[in-house]
């Protein structure tokens, strides 16, 4: 910045010596802390460059992330379910519903819309407090979608298949039919569609074909909003982690060098890029663990009956817009 003229000189000098980028998740850093503490969490700003201008997407949002020591994906899902249920029950015991209904009524004529909005909140909160929430594998979800398409029970714009993943219309169908108004966990997605750090599932598809390998992960689908939480068990074995990194196109160490001491004369960035420290967490000792990330603004919008996430965030920044 230049004196009182308030002009900026733009340079190409790298402030951190190398290009660095906005944070898309704090998960990897939480994994470092869980080595010392059994349960860790953070509520942090997160940035995504998704070119999606929908009521469900913004480029900057808050995400609640947690990591725990566990060998069980069920335990991670239990934690998510109990956390959201407890939060909702406390909302029911508070006076916040009346405030939301009053705020929704402001500027509107008649009580019809307010009554409808009040019923909407009751339905959503009731669904979140029911127990237990259904859990279904990705394979079973695809089968249900394909059966529905063949029997004409549902018409999808995107044909459901193992390789193409679950589209929004598929998630809405699963949430509506399997959950019937309650949240639904979908587990064990294809390995090829998920990040490198996820632990393989304890079982594989019946035909055991390579393209049908799965990882121990889940998405939590909430009616209307759909995916709100994603989580998994993390790969804690150094050889398997580096193998997964290579298969995902990351420059991991060759197997013969995994247990070798790092060469002081060699830059770690030549071996594992910016993830050398992450591999070291496994190389020098790790334990089974898992965690999740919850889209905080999406959940707030669902609880408050707000249909567009851009109305939840005070200064929404999204694809094509960053006004302030």
Predicted features along the sequence, with ranges:
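Metal-assisted phosphate- and nucleotidyl-transfer catalytic regions
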Residues: 1-10, 82-225, 247-287
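Beta-sheet entry/capping signal
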Residues: 19-21, 38-40, 182-185, 219, ...
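Class II aminoacyl-tRNA synthetase-like tRNA-binding/catalytic domains
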Residues: 1-71, 272, 280-282, 301
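Active-site pocket scaffolds in enzymes
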Residues: 232-324
């Amino acid at each position: 910045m230049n004196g009182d003229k308030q002009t900026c000189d733009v340079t190409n000098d790298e402030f951190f010596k190398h290009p660095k980028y906005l944070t898309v998740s704090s998960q990897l850093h939480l994994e470092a802390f869980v080595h010392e503490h059994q349960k860790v969490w953070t509520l942090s700003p997160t940035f995504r460059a998704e070119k999606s201008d929908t009521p469900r997407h913004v480029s900057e949002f808050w995400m609640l992330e947690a990591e725990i020591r566990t060998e069980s994906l069920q335990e991670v899902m239990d934690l998510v379910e109990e956390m959201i249920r407890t939060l909702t029950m406390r909302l029911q015991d508070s006076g916040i519903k009346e405030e939301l209904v009053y705020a929704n009524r402001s500027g509107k004529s008649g009580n019809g819309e307010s009554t409808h909005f009040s019923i909407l909140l009751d339905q959503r909160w009731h669904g979140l407090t029911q127990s237990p929430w259904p859990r279904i594998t990705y394979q079973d979800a695809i089968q249900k979608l394909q059966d529905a398409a063949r029997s004409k029970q549902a018409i999808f714009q995107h044909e459901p298949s193992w390789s193409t993943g679950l589209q929004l219309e598929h998630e809405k169908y699963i949430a509506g039919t399997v959950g019937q108004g309650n949240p639904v966990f979908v587990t064990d997605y294809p390995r090829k569609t998920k990040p490198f750090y996820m632990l393989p599932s304890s079982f594989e598809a019946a035909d055991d074909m390579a393209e049908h390998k799965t990882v121990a992960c889940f998405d939590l689908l909430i009616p209307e909003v759909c995916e709100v939480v994603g989580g998994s068990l993390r790969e804690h074995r150094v050889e398997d982690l580096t193998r997964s990194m290579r298969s995902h196109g990351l420059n991991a160490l060759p197997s013969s060098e995994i247990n070798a001491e790092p060469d002081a004369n060699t830059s770690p960035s030549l071996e594992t890029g910016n993830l050398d420290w992450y591999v070291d967490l496994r190389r020098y000792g790790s334990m089974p663990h898992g965690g999740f990330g919850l889209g905080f603004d999406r959940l707030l919008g669902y609880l408050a009956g707000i249909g567009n996430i851009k109305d939840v965030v005070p200064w929404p920044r999204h694809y094509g817009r960053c006004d302030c």
